[in-house]
A protein has these predicted regions:
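Structural motif
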Residues: 1, 28, 163-164
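Bacterial carbohydrate/catabolite-sensing allosteric modules
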Residues: 8-21, 36, 42-50, 54-187
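Short, ordered loop/turn segments at secondary-structure junctions
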Residues: 3-5, 30, 53-54
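Intrinsically disordered, low-complexity polar regions and short flexible loop motifs
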Residues: 25
Length: 187
């Protein structure tokens, strides 16, 4: 189920779970704070695992991602390749999706700001409405594609564009190819 971070959908799916008799549930983002107690109660009957940032208030099995570290690794790699004028494309950076912001933060603080290139990094995030709309199969791809087209018009000195995830990166690549950029090479 994709709740698209909609509280009503999340509640509906959580209420529906017991009747579906699942073998287990994998939550790929932290449950909304208003549903943590419900998730804990359900986890007594159904195996639950949460994949995302650690949440000390949630008492279920979890796989923690260090999104800040992921951002630092991305930045370090680009700096090692000699890139100093870069753009970072992300889905909406909302309170509900803190991991996105943590990755951006790691990208900036971990390397580019340390090297005094922080002012050479453009962060381009999609509008919050995208998280509220029903997701299309290509929503993240479209974010990468559309925001890359905008970036190329606004910033002519970029040497690299990074996407928060693979689907965004595919959109970035297609936009660059359409604009006749050689990747790797010119971007």
């Amino acid at each position: 189920c994709n709740t698209q971070r909609d509280l009503e959908l999340e509640e509906r799916y959580l209420k529906m779970l017991p009747s579906l008799n699942p073998q287990g549930v994998i939550y790929t983002c932290n449950p909304s704070s208003c549903f943590m107690e419900t998730v804990e109660q359900l986890s007594n009957k159904i195996p639950f695992a949460v994949i995302n940032n650690q949440n000390e208030r949630l008492n279920v099995d979890a796989v923690e991602l260090d999104n800040s570290k992921l951002g630092r690794i991305m930045a370090k790699h680009l700096l090692e390749l000699g890139h100093t004028h870069v753009a970072y494309i992300a889905p909406p950076l909302t309170v509900r999706q803190k991991q996105r912001s943590k990755r951006v933060e790691g990208f900036l603080k971990g390397s580019f700001r340390k090297q005094d290139f922080g002012d050479h990094v453009v962060i381009k995030a999609a509008d919050e409405q995208i998280d509220k709309d029903v997701p299309g199969i290509d929503s993240e791809y479209r974010i990468g594609y559309d925001l890359t087209k905008e970036l190329l018009k606004e910033h002519t000195d970029l040497t690299a564009i990074v996407g928060l995830n693979d689907m965004i990166a595919f959109g970035i690549l297609d936009a660059l190819y359409e604009e006749k950029y050689k990747v790797p090479g010119e971007m």
